[in-house]
């Protein structure tokens, strides 16, 4: 059925379209943290996230990365290929920060010699636990070959993103990706890429991402607007 709400999330709602293989994603003016324990409505945030993610996914598509992104259709809406989401958050860390620093008792800001890829099991009831390859296989999420693909593709995407952000004076600290199976059973990049799911620091170490909200550092939309303007100029 066309225009039927098929999923509602913390930051996005997803609707069906007249094409069974295409969905309409609507970005919300909502910021959350602690797995949704803290929520706040922030006017304009949805449009900024949508525009930033659209720009990034357009560049990834042009660079040969296969993604779910089709086109932006309004300031806070885009069309995407329908996928079966793999219940994994794939996190890549270039620099120590956030939960990584807390977990291992290391200071933020240490550049990792080799970027680290981590898996988190997407399960709200379990608070998205950190898991390893063996857990992924035990849970039947993906197989060895698919695990290797997820890691390799994430590292490839990281190299592209690091270069693009460096060109606009931003350091890509870490980020979270989600992947899904398309109608042909191929794994493709899904979800979004915005300051909601990555850490960006400027040359002075200022946070240009959702940590502004998490740590009460100022106006989230002001920071996101700066990131958007930098990406438009890229």
Swiss-Prot record:
PANTHER family the record matches: MULTIFUNCTIONAL PROTEIN ADE2, SI:DKEY-6E2.2
Superkingdom as given in the UniProt entry: Bacteria
Enzyme Commission number(s): 6.3.2.6
InterPro entries to which the protein is assigned, alphabetical: SAICAR_synt/ADE2_N, SAICAR_synt_PurC, SAICAR_synth, SAICAR_synthetase, SAICAR_synthetase_CS
Classification via CDD domains: SAICAR_synt_PurC
Listed pathway(s): Purine metabolism; IMP biosynthesis via de novo pathway; 5-amino-1-(5-phospho-D-ribosyl)imidazole-4-carboxamide from 5-amino-1-(5-phospho-D-ribosyl)imidazole-4-carboxylate: step 1/2
Family under the similarity heading: Belongs to the SAICAR synthetase family.
One GO MF term attached to the UniProt entry: ATP binding
Any Gene Ontology biological process: cobalamin biosynthetic process
PROSITE patterns recorded: SAICAR_SYNTHETASE_1, SAICAR_SYNTHETASE_2
Name of the protein in its database record: Phosphoribosylaminoimidazole-succinocarboxamide synthase
Originating gene: purC
